[in-house]
């Protein structure tokens, strides 16, 4: 109450920020007349002037009025569009490390040119981030003439580019790119084996379009570069046959309740849980099929991988639906984004789920992969010095943007008042009655020439409604993941009089629906259109446009509420753009997923009793309150999940940052000899400590074991026992000095043979290869730790603290292993002179001749062994004459026949 009174008097923080920015807008507007008098050349020269002023120490913020005035004037001349005052405000918000909420149709693409131009003046590069390559290309090509007029270069970074094209894209002043390609390039850069193979030089300023989709909806999706792992496709097929014999029960067993099923489902988290009866049934089945021995537990350490496959199969069958969560296309499982309804080609679920779904659908099971490098969008975009974003729906997630990314959300007012009629939700007893009412509403709109956009939450629902409309004889278009290729054309026609379009949640987002249809799309279809043709198309469009406006504009129908209010607002936001008329209404039923999952059985039963007549709809404030509570529950649950993920990933992120920083230092340095020397000293001290404890008595020393270790791991054959006997002054410090001196001397001898440059390159190669291999293994170990860490809670321990503690220990162990492996490899490598190489080649040829003779003898005599031996027989345990340093039986002797 008090807050409301104070806000009325002083205004909200959003209002105060807008008032402050309006002062800047007035300054920019005053410059307009002056800039209109500039010639094209004078306007272009402003870019050089601004860059010079920045180099001379002027702050970027001081350039805002003139830079924005420059872009506005250039936009008028090149694009034929003048940015509105609210777009100038949006541009300033985006420059201030904030999120600008701008309604659909308010010109976000043009608004973005203002902060992009300003920040590109620094020469550090600007990345404009979009959700797909179509939007990246479209926005880049739309704004390219403007930026190039002002002397800025524009690049496009999308999947499928050659290294040269990608390098050119990143070298541009302003780069349009997809979020996934930026993230994968970052990971690929940190797997590169030379500095020249890296693409991303500097992460300076990122402007994220549809920021809620990327930083909220995609936050829990890690970007992963993976390599092949062990094939277990047969196991997935076997476990797939187990699922049909299992019985589901409604809720988990408790002291008060004991069900008779084998498993329960957690629909909120998409997880399955086995009951004790289920475990016993599965163990019996596994024994019968020979997967486990009698009396062996499913939870024994040796069989834990079986449990992994069982849970994957259970989730695949019971929690993931075809044409809802995925589609089958060309014999492959393609994931459908639950938020956008778009297919995500190339994406795969982890934890064996994708393989389990492949087994379920009877398509080829592709091998599991081992993670080589990974990062979440949350942590990738926090790497930028300056981050901003824009979307039509951010205010509902403002708290999360502030908490996770430190980004404040500013709601930008519309250029014209929004007059859309958002009608009260209407509830039905079941889905059939709801669909009947939707079809009646659509019939009414079609009769009045009003276009309709119907939003569904899945492909399955869109096809159900499509069938119902077809039966009713209503012409319509369907836009979902199955008809993705026709997206642009369907959206272009969605504003025609009486047009009916069914779309999954946000499929087609990023493209406005123009009342009367998109006349520009019609013109684009023509080859070399004449002025007369263009004018005729415009005139026809104007008639259609007025017809649709008179009918009430675009009518939005939501077939059910989404888990998130933001997704509902995105659907509504399709209508009422730039002051156009429009309307919206959501049709709900008690069968809807949101109701079933998030409302108690008691509430559902109470609501069922409120329906007294068949097929009647119900509108009430209480209903709106119930839905709002359900959505608030889901949003809080999802926020907690993303926050929890970030807290765990931050641990890995600190380690990732340390490793990648070290790796980039290695790539940038031509000479790492000093680093190797420091590591060598550390490794030898550590090894000697194992056998000669610091400050210990001579009797505690294990010299024979140390001699063996030095010979095996470092190829150093040192008479330590003899040194100890002959030298009375021989102590721990002398031992360390002598061992290290011999190691360095031996290493320098090798260096003299091959030359400094070759040795430096070899050192760098060994260091990088070892680091990459150990980091890959570490990621796998961290993943296993993460999966099981929640069990520590049963021991009254904080899983997060335990994860931090154990992962840190694993990280330090990995670094110790890295040092040891690098020095071991460098110490054991054998350097051969040209003379030795020639001798080895002669020995190899002799072996080849003997092998050929053996083959010839076998062919001629039909016997399995050759009795005559030529000259000297090489012993199986002797060194191979090829010079590899391996025993003959493990090298060329493995091929020779005796």
From Swiss-Prot:
Binding site for ATP: 87, 105-109, 512
Residues at which Zn(2+) binds: 880, 882, 891-892
GO biological process: intracellular protein transmembrane transport; protein import; protein targeting; protein transport by the Sec complex
Alphabetized InterPro entries for the sequence: Helicase_ATP-bd (IPR014001), Helicase_C-like (IPR001650), P-loop_NTPase (IPR027417), SEC_C_motif (IPR004027), SecA (IPR000185), SecA_CS (IPR020937), SecA_DEAD (IPR011115), SecA_motor_DEAD (IPR014018)
SMART domains named in the record: SecA_DEAD (SM00957), SecA_PP_bind (SM00958)
Catalyzed reactions per annotation: ATP + H2O + cellular proteinSide 1 = ADP + phosphate + cellular proteinSide 2
UniProt-annotated location(s): Cell inner membrane; Cytoplasm
Membrane topology: Peripheral membrane protein
Bias (Polar residues) ranges: 855-865
Source organism of this protein record: Histophilus somni (strain 2336)
Quaternary context: Monomer and homodimer. Part of the essential Sec protein translocation apparatus which comprises SecA, SecYEG and auxiliary proteins SecDF-YajC and YidC.
Record protein name field: Protein translocase subunit SecA
Gene from which the chain derives: secA
GO molecular function, one term: protein-exporting ATPase activity
Cofactor(s) essential for the protein: Zn(2+)
Enzyme Commission number(s) from the entry: 7.4.2.8
Function: Part of the Sec protein translocase complex. Interacts with the SecYEG preprotein conducting channel. Has a central role in coupling the hydrolysis of ATP to the transfer of proteins into and across the cell membrane, serving both as a receptor for the preprotein-SecB complex and as an ATP-driven molecular motor driving the stepwise translocation of polypeptide chains across the membrane.
Family: Belongs to the SecA family.
GO annotations of cellular component type: cell envelope Sec protein transport complex; cytosol; plasma membrane
Compositional bias (Basic residues): 886-898
Coiled coil: none
């Amino acid at each position: 109450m008090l807050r409301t009174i104070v806000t009325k008097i002083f205004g909200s923080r959003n209002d105060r920020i807008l008032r402050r920015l309006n002062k800047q807008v007035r300054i920019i507007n005053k410059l307009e007349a002056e800039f209109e008098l500039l010639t094209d050349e004078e306007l272009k020269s402003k870019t050089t002037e601004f860059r010079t002023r920045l180099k001379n120490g002027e702050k970027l913020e001081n350039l805002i009025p003139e830079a924005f005035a420059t872009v506005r004037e250039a936009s008028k001349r090149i694009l034929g569009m003048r940015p509105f005052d609210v777009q100038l405000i949006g541009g300033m918000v985006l420059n201030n490390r904030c999120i600008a909420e701008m309604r659909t149709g308010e010109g976000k693409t043009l608004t973005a040119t203002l902060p992009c131009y300003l920040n590109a003046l620094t020469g550090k590069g600007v990345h404009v981030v979009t959700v797909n390559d179509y939007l990246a290309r479209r926005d880049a090509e739309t704004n390219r003439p403007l930026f190039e007029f002002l002397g800025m270069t524009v690049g496009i970074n999308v999947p499928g580019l050659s290294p040269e094209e990608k390098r050119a894209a990143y070298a541009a002043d302003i780069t349009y790119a997809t979020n996934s390609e930026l993230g994968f390039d970052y990971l690929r850069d940190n797997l590169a084996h030379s500095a020249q193979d890296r693409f991303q030089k500097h992460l300076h300023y990122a402007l994220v379009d549809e920021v809620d989709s990327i930083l909220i909806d995609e936050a829990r999706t890690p970007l992963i570069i993976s390599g092949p792992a062990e094939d277990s496709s047969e196991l997935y097929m076997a476990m797939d046959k187990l699922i049909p014999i299992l019985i589901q029960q409604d809720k988990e067993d408790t002291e008060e309740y004991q069900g008779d099923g084998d498993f329960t489902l957690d629909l909120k988290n998409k997880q399955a849980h086995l009951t004790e009866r289920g475990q016993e049934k599965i163990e019996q089945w596994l024994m019968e099929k020979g997967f486990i021995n009698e009396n062996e537990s499913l939870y024994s350490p040796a069989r834990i991988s079986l449990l992994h496959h069982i849970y994957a199969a259970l989730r695949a069958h019971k929690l993931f639906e075809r044409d809802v969560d995925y589609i089958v296309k060309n014999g492959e499982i393609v994931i459908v984004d639950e938020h956008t309804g778009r297919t995500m080609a190339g994406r795969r679920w982890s934890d064996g789920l994708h393989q389990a779904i492949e087994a379920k659908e009877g398509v080829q099971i592709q091998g599991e992969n081992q993670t080589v490098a990974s990062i979440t969008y949350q942590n990738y975009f926090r790497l930028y010095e300056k981050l901003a974003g824009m979307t039509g729906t951010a205010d509902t997630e403002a708290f999360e943007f502030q908490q996770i990314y430190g980004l404040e959300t500013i709601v930008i007012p519309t250029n014209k008042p929004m007059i859309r009629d958002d009608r009260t939700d209407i509830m039905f007893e079941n889905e059939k009655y709801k669909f009947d009412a939707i079809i009646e509403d659509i019939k009414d709109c079609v009769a009045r020439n009003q276009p309709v956009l119907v939003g569904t939450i899945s492909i399955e629902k869109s096809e159900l409604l499509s069938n119902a409309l077809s039966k009713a004889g209503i012409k319509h278009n369907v836009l979902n993941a199955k008809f993705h290729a026709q997206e642009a054309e369907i959206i272009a026609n969605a504003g025609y009089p009486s047009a009916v379009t069914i779309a999954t949640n946000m499929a087609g987002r990023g493209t406005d629906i123009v009342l009367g249809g998109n006349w520009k799309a019609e013109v684009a279809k023509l080859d070399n259109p004449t002025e007369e043709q263009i004018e005729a198309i415009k005139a026809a469009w104007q008639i259609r446009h007025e017809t649709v406006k008179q009918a009430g504009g675009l009518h939005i129908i939501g077939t059910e509420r989404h888990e998130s209010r933001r997704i509902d607002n995105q659907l509504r936001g399709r209508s009422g753009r730039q002051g156009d008329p429009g309307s919206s209404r959501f049709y709900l039923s008690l069968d809807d997923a949101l109701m079933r999952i998030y409302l108690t059985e008691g509430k559902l039963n109470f609501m069922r009793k409120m329906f007294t007549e068949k097929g009647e709809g119900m509108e009430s404030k209480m209903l709106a309150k119930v839905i709002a509570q359900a959505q608030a529950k889901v949003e809080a649950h999802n926020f907690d999940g993303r926050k929890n993920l970030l807290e765990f990933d931050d641990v890995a992120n600190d380690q990732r940052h340390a490793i990648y920083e070290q790796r980039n230092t290695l790539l940038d340095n031509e000479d790492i000899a000093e680093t190797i020397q420091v590591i060598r000293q550390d490794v030898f001290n550590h090894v000697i400590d194992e056998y000669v404890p610091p400050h210990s008595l001579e009797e505690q020393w294990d010299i024979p074991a140390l001699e063996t270790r030095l010979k095996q791991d470092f190829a150093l054959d040192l008479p330590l026992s003899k040194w100890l006997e002959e030298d009375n002054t021989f102590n721990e410090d002398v031992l360390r000095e002598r061992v290290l001196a011999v190691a360095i001397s031996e290493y320098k001898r090798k260096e003299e043979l091959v030359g400094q440059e070759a040795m430096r390159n070899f050192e760098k190669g060994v260091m990088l290869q070892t680091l990459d291999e150990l980091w890959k293994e570490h990621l796998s170990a961290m993943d296993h730790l993460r999966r099981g860490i929640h069990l520590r809670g049963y021991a009254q321990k904080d899983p997060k603290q335990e994860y931090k503690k154990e992962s840190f220990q694993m990280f330090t162990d990995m670094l110790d292993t890295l040092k040891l492996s690098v020095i071991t490899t460098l110490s054991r490598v054998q350097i051969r002179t040209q003379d030795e190489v020639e001798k080895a080649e002669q020995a190899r040829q002799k072996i080849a001749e003997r092998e050929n003779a053996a083959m010839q003898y076998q062919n001629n005599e039909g016997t399995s062994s050759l009795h005559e031996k030529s000259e000297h027989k090489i012993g199986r345990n002797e060194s191979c004459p090829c010079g590899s340093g391996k025993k003959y039986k493990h090298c060329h002797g493995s091929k020779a026949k005796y």
